[in-house]
Amino acid sequence: MQIFLATTNEGKVRELKNLLGTGFEVFCLKDFPEITPAVEDGSSFKENAVKKASHAASLTKMWTLADDSGLVVDALSGAPGIYSARFAGENADDKANNAKLLNLLTDIPEAERTARFVSAVALVSPTGETTVFEGSCEGTILFAADGTEGFGYDPLFYSADLHKSFGQASADEKNAVSHRSRAMSKACAYLKERK
């Protein structure tokens, strides 16, 4: 069975291949340079994931997966949310996004720094049938970065599952409890039933 993953992220492609196991051929945007990524202008992770998957499925005619994910901080009314990657501005890097997050949480006590990573994975069939799978992982935002592993907000996110920051966790530890792997595992189980 052929699967298209609407991403250029090789890490996501490797993760999907591992979750699916044998009998699946996985393609991504790098394999189809003529496909331009969909514009992510939805108002939720789910909307953005569906837009990306539907756009790519209409062009490839393959089973297509796309995800949208980010950090949701309760004390910030859900921000950065769908703007996680560009929280400090359109071309902001991880350092700038983390600095803005810490600045906004300066006066927020530890007990009120609850947060979660959220992922929506949209799966679109070759005929356009759409199913969405969601995953999340709970934690809190630390007062300073802790660890050098991962990317994005990982050094600031203290995982309730791991009892350490994602910045201290190995890739295998993080992937065992991450929002994306939880959502993607559900999507892979669904695909295996249809193989």
Stretches with model-predicted labels:
Residues Q2-F4, G11-K195:
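Anionic-ligand binding patches
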